[in-house]
């Protein structure tokens, strides 16, 4: 009996060692300052300097979150989407919301493709096919080996990113890598980045649309600050050159109001670190930083 137990223990240690080696060998960060392909719209409209436009930013949660879904990293119970049909139903509702707003520009985050957690639905293609009137760029923001975590319901392989849509002519787009932790947490923070999509304006200037999803579940405040510094510096450079910049995304920071210190992932947005040419534009009556540890209710969450 002792030999059997020891043999099983050795086997488990061997399997764990092989898996850890696999995760380390599979890990690689995408290069910084990566040129992104642009999918052209059927027709692009001219963006004018003296006209108001609407921009929408939306973390779609890889199409997994109906109202009663709770996410394990927030203290909830679920990891993956419930089914492929559920993913498609959630994406369809997301598209309905997008269409009802009819924005000129759209920044989407957590847009999956080839992801086990979202039943490998090609979500960038879903939105591009549904919205042929938009030019688009896509930047990878997650890519990982098979993550056997949590053990009871592994998240699996993740491939996801940032999708930017523009009715104005998009001439080029670039992906910039963000600093992340270098310890074991890097396998869960995946490959943070922001994208910059360049849109032409009728006065000869350019509009740079930034799409970003900053790290959430890290405790290293130095890394959190470094991510924002790189983003701010890039935006300031274009603003100083006389061009237009706008950034929309999932900051995992409180843009207005107070942060809750008991939530380690929630930080106040460092408005004081913005250059004089940049400012925060956020509604004060609709807090957008929300925990998903409990099912959503109109008056309770």
Language-model region placement:
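Metal-dependent phosphoesterases centered on the DNase I-like endonuclease/exonuclease/phosphatase
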Residues: 218-301
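N-terminal, active-site-proximal structural segment of metallo-dependent hydrolase catalytic domains
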Residues: 2-130, 138-153
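Surface-exposed cleft-lining segments at the edges of enzyme active sites
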Residues: 77-83, 111-114, 178-186, 213-222, ...
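Beta-strand-turn-beta hairpins that frame and shape the catalytic cleft
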Residues: 45-55, 64-67, 158, 162-172, ...
